[in-house]
Curated annotation (Swiss-Prot):
Sugar-modified residues: N121, N125, N180
Transmembrane segments: 18-38, 40-60, 132-152
Pathway it works in: Glycerolipid metabolism; triacylglycerol biosynthesis
Function: Involved in glycerolipid synthesis and lipid metabolism. Catalyzes the formation of diacylglycerol, the precursor of triacylglycerol, by transferring the acyl chain of a fatty acyl-CoA to a monoacylglycerol, mainly at the sn-1 or sn-3 positions. It uses both sn-2-monoacylglycerol (2-acylglycerol) and sn-1-monoacylglycerol (1-acyl-sn-glycerol) equally well as substrates, and uses sn-3-monoacylglycerol (3-acyl-sn-glycerol) with lower efficiency. Probably not involved in absorption of dietary fat in the small intestine.
Family: Belongs to the diacylglycerol acyltransferase family.
MF terms (GO), sorted A to Z: 2-acylglycerol O-acyltransferase activity; diacylglycerol O-acyltransferase activity
Catalytic activity: a 2-acylglycerol + an acyl-CoA = a 1,2-diacylglycerol + CoA; 2-(9Z-octadecenoyl)-glycerol + butanoyl-CoA = 1-butanoyl-2-(9Z-octadecenoyl)-glycerol + CoA; 2-(9Z-octadecenoyl)-glycerol + octanoyl-CoA = 1-octanoyl-2-(9Z-octadecenoyl)-glycerol + CoA; 2-(9Z-octadecenoyl)-glycerol + dodecanoyl-CoA = 1-dodecanoyl-2-(9Z-octadecenoyl)-glycerol + CoA
Expressed in which tissues: Expressed in stomach and liver.
A GO BP annotation: triglyceride biosynthetic process
Protein name, entry field: 2-acylglycerol O-acyltransferase 1
Membrane topology of the entry: Multi-pass membrane protein
Entry GO CC: endoplasmic reticulum membrane
EC number in record: 2.3.1.22
Source organism per UniProt: Homo sapiens
Amino acid sequence: MKVEFAPLNIQLARRLQTVAVLQWVLKYLLLGPMSIGITVMLIIHNYLFLYIPYLMWLYFDWHTPERGGRRSSWIKNWTLWKHFKDYFPIHLIKTQDLDPSHNYIFGFHPHGIMAVGAFGNFSVNYSDFKDLFPGFTSYLHVLPLWFWCPVFREYVMSVGLVSVSKKSVSYMVSKEGGGNISVIVLGGAKESLDAHPGKFTLFIRQRKGFVKIALTHGASLVPVVSFGENELFKQTDNPEGSWIRTVQNKLQKIMGFALPLFHARGVFQYNFGLMTYRKAIHTVVGRPIPVRQTLNPTQEQIEELHQTYMEELRKLFEEHKGKYGIPEHETLVLK
């Protein structure tokens, strides 16, 4: 296979964009395990003066990710994130105004390999979110295990991430006076195993917890489709029933997160590596589904609202797919 190298005379702006995405990918993949490893080494080598104060801090701070987190405007405003956004580039599209006196749950689809569009649009401060949705604060919910990693948890909270636990989502959408948007990548880790270019498979039919929370607190539901998310990486073929998929499913059940076998490009060549491809991401925010507060929703009410959500999600995809290069015959597969 002939290796296609990146040209040497690339503009500085593009080099900065590459650096911004590279650091994000490396942090996404390595910072959590590294922080655990460093903590273990400190304990093994008896650096009490370092790890004892931090473990005490963890004890008192353990539930912060379920109470809105601890974001840092300074970190969220790093110029680094502008270069990150411009690399793809990432776009946010609004289809309807939202009322800032209410709280909302955004269902983000698809997960892709790393949910790049969710992070770029709803976590750091260089998307058009503040202009499109004035009066709102967005909170991107991620797996609770992200907050089990010492030090790493402080970093992910600083960029606005919070836990996706029931307690955390309920806390955000029960805010008096509204103005909160909880962004949940509903397909989760399981959906990343179906993140193949040109495919639109969403794991949603069994995801009903967000519907119950919406009913309990009267939070409106909003489907969000991120076109281009599945084009950022290539993944090893892993159809249902294959030995690769069987192993991946078992590991996902054991560990709580998936291990897709993916690749894209490198820093200095375009053939192989863990850098994402330069593919545009268009994240389209759909119409809100009004939800009447029901403190003790029945299963029938949950099923009805869940069905309405899936119908609105499908409509959103069909209405906008042509604008972003999706063939007319392609449709969503809801699992």
